[in-house]
Regions:
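Conserved beta-sheet core of the metallophosphoesterase superfamily
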Residues: 94-171
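Core catalytic region of metal-dependent phosphoesterases/phosphodiesterases
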Residues: 3-6, 10-104
Length: 171
């Protein structure tokens, strides 16, 4: 089975009470957050599952504790590079079945098949968006940027205009 997750920010104190806690997560410490993620991940995911991680797995990839923690996470892990992912440590890279920036897959939900476009960053136009494909992304959290992005996507989907009107070159 396929699963999707993003913006875990393992070992990021600014996602807990030890720092700014940007997302308002209910964790006093990094250790508490990491343990919660590990336990809930492994309670749901089996080694036969594939997990698409839509970026920002952690703040750094050269941390021994990070490598040990990610090694404990079940399933085949596919990482989409996020702005906080440091992939300079080969040992960390080897924990993932693949590391990429973008991928399109087909996935079935409730008996219907959909094209999913997967990446870390939101984009305003993606392959098949007007034919039912779904963009799955992370990065924006619950921010004003996310609200603005959703407003723009809604506007684009309501106004399906071509960039070159009526097939004529424009200037």
């Amino acid at each position: 089975m396929n699963y999707f997750i993003g913006d875990l920010h393992l070992f990021n104190r600014n996602q807990t009470g030890e720092g700014v806690n940007y997302d308002g997560r209910p964790f006093a410490t990094v250790a508490e957050m990491n343990q919660y993620i590990l336990e809930h991940w492994n309670a749901k995911i089996t080694n036969g599952d594939t997990v698409y991680i839509l970026g920002d797995m952690a703040m750094r990839g050269r941390n021994e504790a990070l490598i040990a923690l990610v090694a404990q996470l079940k399933g085949q892990k596919i990482l989409f590079r996020g702005n906080h992912d440091d992939l300079s440590d080969y040992r960390y890279q080897k924990l993932f079945a693949d590391i990429t920036d973008y991928r399109e897959i087909s996935e079935s939900f409730d008996g219907q098949s959909y094209k999913l476009c997967l990446m870390h960053y939101p984009i305003l136009m993606w392959n098949g968006q007007h034919r039912g494909s779904i963009l799955l992304y992370a990065h924006t959290h619950n921010t004003v940027e996310e609200t603005f992005f959703q407003k723009c996507v809604k506007e684009l989907n309501e106004n399906k205009k071509l960039s070159v009107q009526q097939g004529k070159p424009i200037r």
